[in-house]
Amino acid sequence: MNNITTYKNAKAGRMIPESYDALLKLWGADIKELDIFGRYGTTHVIETGNQNMPPLVLFHGVGDDAALMWIYNAKELGQHFHVFAVDTIGGPGKSVPGDGYDKSFYDEIWISELLDKLGLGKIFMAGVSNGAYLTQMYTIKNPERVIKAVSMAGVPVKTSGNSKKAAMKAMMKVFLPEALFPSDKNVMKLIRKMTGSNYTAFTNNETVFRHFKQLMTGFKRSAMLNHKVIGFSEEEIFSLKDKLLCIVGRKDPFIMLGGAELEEALKQYPLQVIFMDDAGHGINHEKAAEVNKLIVDFFSDGNL
């Protein structure tokens, strides 16, 4: 029997879902919450937007959830799309891992099964951070199903034997030491470290700030270890040429760690990449209006 839990203790298991619900009230949109059962457990999905418009499936990052990730995007995107915001299974949202969620877990199978059970055929897809990776991976593996995709705070990474080690090293550089001692002061410092000048998108909204802190203190990150991040071949990255838009911030600490070398490396691929000078890892919060418009405009050329 699977004994994976996503929260560190019972208190976190109560408080995080409560503040999740408080965030949903701030979306300013009509929503429906769905629980989709599958081979890996129950995946929670927030449905919103215009049901007569094309489907847009959204994925958040590690240690995050759909309620927080799309708080500044869902209402506007819902004017143009039938939105399905997914809580990653193993993450701190309302998805619940089942017996099948083990080392054999495979993101592509999970997403395909979820889309099938939602009755979705061809879709638009967008994601942030790890959600950007999921978006890139699924678009590469299922080009016939993904019309177009947008990845934010994440760019396609070429296959490398050291990629996992490098990713862990980058995570430690960014999150430590603040994440070890998540007081209000340290959470504020971490937010400032991860964002550009509009860090107030996280700090001036008390509900957003408290939920962010609760995720830092109460989410058991080991619950995500069954997710595997696999680099792509050059051929796979080239296949994204006409389908993928990458939106990244120059103040994103993960992008900054790559430095000029990352930008030079990206130039060898025919990818559509937009750099925002004063945005960080929370780019869709920090620059919500601009990001919303970029997504809508990029997808407006797609055809079902």
Positions of predicted regions on the chain:
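Alpha/beta-hydrolase fold catalytic core
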Residues: M1-L56, H80-F81, G121, S300-L304
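Conserved HGGG/HGGXW glycine-rich cap/lid loop of the alpha/beta-hydrolase fold
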Residues: G41-G93
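Active-site loop/oxyanion-hole signature of alpha/beta-hydrolase fold enzymes
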Residues: F84-A126
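Gly/Ala-rich beta-loop-alpha elbow adjacent to hydrolase catalytic centers
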Residues: G127, G131, T135
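Flexible "cap/lid" loop of the alpha/beta hydrolase fold
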Residues: I140, K148-E178
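Conserved alpha/beta-hydrolase catalytic His-Asp/Glu region
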Residues: S160-N162, L180-S239
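Conserved loop-alpha-helix segment in the C-terminal half of the alpha/beta-hydrolase fold
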Residues: L245-A279
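Catalytic active-site module of serine/aspartate enzymes centered on a nucleophile-bearing elbow/loop
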Residues: Y269-L304
